[in-house]
């Protein structure tokens, strides 16, 4: 294999307010807990089921950390891109412990706030921790790959129509 890719993309909701920790050297890290849920209908009973996964996120990018600290709150919907990293540490009894988390570092990460203005949307850091930008609107994208709503898409193709609300349909296979 010529190379490998370590990229994580999550769209979910914060389970609590961001936790900010400062280092002695003046740097800081912002920790998030993001919930993603999947729903399905049990074939045997017809009952709707749901499973929620909790993801630990550590933001080391200074600009993205500032946006998260100022604007994100419990319940905020966010889109993040980062890398999966596992770190080793020792608990109070000296036992080795491992934590796997999504890490947002400078030049390799992204954070976009989704949802309405009441949730603080409209701010985001671009690729490479590129500061702070106003994305506007309650949803940033109409359809996958069609570009920002109300703006020019990256390609020459026109953007698609509105969202389809047929997520309750069963998969046809």
Curated annotation (Swiss-Prot):
Biased segments, Gly residues type: 115-131, 147-162
PROSITE patterns, alphabetized: SSB
Stated name of the protein: Single-stranded DNA-binding protein
Role, per record: Plays an important role in DNA replication, recombination and repair. Binds to ssDNA and to an array of partner proteins to recruit them to their sites of action during DNA metabolism.
Keyword Lipid biosynthesis: no
Molecular functions per Gene Ontology: single-stranded DNA binding
Region (Disordered): 113-173
InterPro entries per UniProt: NA-bd_OB-fold, Primosome_PriB/ssb, ssDNA-bd
Keywords: DNA damage, DNA recombination, DNA repair, DNA replication, DNA-binding
Cystine crosslinks: none
Example GO BP: DNA recombination
A Gene Ontology term for the protein's cellular component: nucleoid
Placement of sequence motif Important for interaction with partner proteins: 168-173
Boundaries of every SSB domain copy: 5-111
Assembly with partners or alone: Homotetramer.
């Amino acid at each position: 294999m010529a190379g490998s890719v370590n990229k994580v993309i999550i769209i979910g909701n914060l389970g609590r307010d961001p936790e900010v920790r400062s280092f002695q050297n003046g740097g800081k890290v912002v920790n998030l807990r993001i919930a993603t849920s999947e729903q399905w209908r049990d074939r045997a009973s017809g009952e709707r089921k749901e499973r929620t996964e909790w993801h630990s996120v550590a933001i080391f990018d200074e600009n993205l950390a500032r946006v998260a600290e100022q604007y994100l709150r419990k319940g905020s919907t966010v889109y993040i891109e980062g890398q999966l990293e596992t770190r080793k540490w020792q608990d109070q009894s000296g036992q080795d412990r491992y934590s796997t988390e999504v890490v947002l570092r400078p030049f390799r990460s992204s954070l976009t706030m989704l949802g309405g203005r009441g949730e603080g949307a409209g701010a985001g850091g671009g690729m490479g921790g590129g500061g702070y930008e106003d994305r506007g609107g309650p949803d940033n994208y109409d359809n996958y790959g069609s570009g920002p709503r109300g703006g020019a898409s990256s390609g020459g193709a026109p953007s698609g129509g509105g969202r389809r609300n047929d997520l309750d349909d069963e998969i046809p296979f």
